[in-house]
């Protein structure tokens, strides 16, 4: 697979570049704020950078007819409109979290919330101190899976890649459902699965849920 990385000098970009390359794929488009390395046309472009980069990323996808894997968080309605328009021309996989564990957890929560709908419920999420958006995109995904109004408590500490806990409680019991990312590599491995998933697709908008369904159902 010929691939491109937007934000290749960032922490996540470096991990993506490493994971894809070690799996035998060839980086031929590397984009960052101060440098662009353009060797050939990529089959898939991966962007885990910032919302501000999305318009440029979209233009490269259109230029090369490249499919897109996007894990950027804090997207607005404007950004989703860009992705919607792009998905009419190429295949797009968008998620706020590309770890397999979180996406399985989302499936579990959709079932659990129906059985625990009269229990109190709150979400806590902890990320590294340099993460700007609060709450995290993953916490929003968890809240959406619960399909109810819940408080989200956000902490920014040290270098934690991602720690999410959903708590259910009644007067005598507490259930904690927790996911902890030990390394950023888990997100890059998920992005690789997503890239392989859309490699030969012509167009359409997909989420990581579609990939989980194909893999496990």
Swiss-Prot record:
Q: Name one GO cellular component term.
A: cytosol
Binding of (S)-2,3,4,5-tetrahydrodipicolinate: at which residues? Answer: 128, 137-138
Q: Mention any Pfam family matching this sequence.
A: DapB_N
From the Swiss-Prot or TrEMBL record, state where the protein is found: Cytoplasm
Q: In which pathway does it act?
A: Amino-acid biosynthesis; L-lysine biosynthesis via DAP pathway; (S)-tetrahydrodipicolinate from L-aspartate: step 4/4
UniProt keyword Amino-acid biosynthesis, yes or no: yes
UniProt KW keywords = Amino-acid biosynthesis, Cytoplasm, Diaminopimelate biosynthesis, Lysine biosynthesis, NAD, NADP, Oxidoreductase
Catalytic activity field: (S)-2,3,4,5-tetrahydrodipicolinate + NAD(+) + H2O = (2S,4S)-4-hydroxy-2,3,4,5-tetrahydrodipicolinate + NADH + H(+); (S)-2,3,4,5-tetrahydrodipicolinate + NADP(+) + H2O = (2S,4S)-4-hydroxy-2,3,4,5-tetrahydrodipicolinate + NADPH + H(+)
- Disulfide-bonded cysteines: none
Any single GO BP term: diaminopimelate biosynthetic process
Q: What is its EC number?
A: 1.17.1.8
- Annotated PROSITE patterns: DAPB
Q: Where is the active site?
A: 127 (proton donor/acceptor), 131 (proton donor)
Q: Which molecular-function annotations from GO does this UniProt entry contain?
A: 4-hydroxy-tetrahydrodipicolinate reductase; NAD binding; NADP binding; oxidoreductase activity, acting on CH or CH2 groups, NAD or NADP as acceptor
Q: Which residues form a coiled coil?
A: none
Predominant subcellular localization, coarse grouping: cytoplasm
The UniProt annotation places NAD(+) binding at: 7-12, 71-73, 95-98
Q: If you read the UniProt record, what top EC class would you report for this enzyme, in one word? A: oxidoreductase
Function of the molecule: Catalyzes the conversion of 4-hydroxy-tetrahydrodipicolinate (HTPA) to tetrahydrodipicolinate.
Name the protein family.
Belongs to the DapB family.
Q: What is this protein called?
A: 4-hydroxy-tetrahydrodipicolinate reductase
Q: What is the species listed in this Swiss-Prot or TrEMBL entry?
A: Thermosipho africanus (strain TCF52B)
The organism's taxonomy opens as: Bacteria, Thermotogati, Thermotogota, Thermotogae, Thermotogales
